[in-house]
C-alpha cells in the first residue's frame, strides 16, 4: 500500500484547510504545475480546485486514528513533502509510527503532493524498491 494523502487521517483539519485555501492563494509553483497538466487554461484549473474543495464533506466515515492505522497489515509506503504547506510533517511521522511494516519517505524540498512534480523519477525507484521487498 502507498499512502499518498493524509486527509482521511485528520478529516476535520482537512475540511477546514479545504475551505480556507482560496484558489488565488495557491503558490505560483502549483499554478505552473497545473498549467502544464491542464491545457484548457485557468478556468479548468479553478474548476478542479473548486471540485476538490467540494470534497470537504466526504470524509466522515474515514477518520483514521493511530489505533485504526495499527490494524493495517499491508506493507505501507508513506510519502510526504518536507515543505508541505497544508499539513505538518508530524502527521506523516505519526502515521509511520502507527502502521506496522511501514516506511516513510520524506521528499526533500517537496511540497504538497511531491510525487506529482519533480520527484517522479525518485518516486518510481523508491516505490519499485519498496514493492520488491
Annotated model-derived regions:
Residues 13-17, 91, 117-120:
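Short aromatic-enriched loop/helix-cap "lid" or pocket-rim segments at secondary-structure transitions
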Residues 51-68:
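Active-site nucleophile elbow and catalytic-triad environment of alpha/beta-hydrolase enzymes
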Amino acid at each position: 500500500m502507498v499512502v499518498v494523502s493524509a486527509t482521511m487521517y485528520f478529516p476535520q483539519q482537512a475540511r477546514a484547510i479545504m475551505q480556507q485555501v482560496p484558489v488565488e492563494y495557491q503558490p505560483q509553483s502549483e499554478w505552473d504545475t497545473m498549467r502544464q497538466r491542464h491545457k484548457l487554461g485557468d478556468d479548468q484549473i479553478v474548476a478542479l480546485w473548486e471540485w476538490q474543495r467540494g470534497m470537504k464533506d466526504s470524509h466522515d466515515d474515514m477518520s483514521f486514528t493511530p489505533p485504526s492505522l495499527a490494524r493495517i497489515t499491508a506493507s505501507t509506503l508513506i510519502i510526504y513533502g518536507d515543505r508541505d504547506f497544508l499539513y505538518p510533517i508530524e502527521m506523516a511521522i505519526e502515521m509511520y509510527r502507527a502502521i506496522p511494516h511501514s516506511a516513510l519517505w520524506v521528499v526533500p524540498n517537496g511540497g504538497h503532493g511531491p510525487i506529482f512534480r519533480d520527484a517522479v523519477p525518485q518516486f518510481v525507484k523508491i516505490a519499485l524498491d519498496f514493492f520488491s521487498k
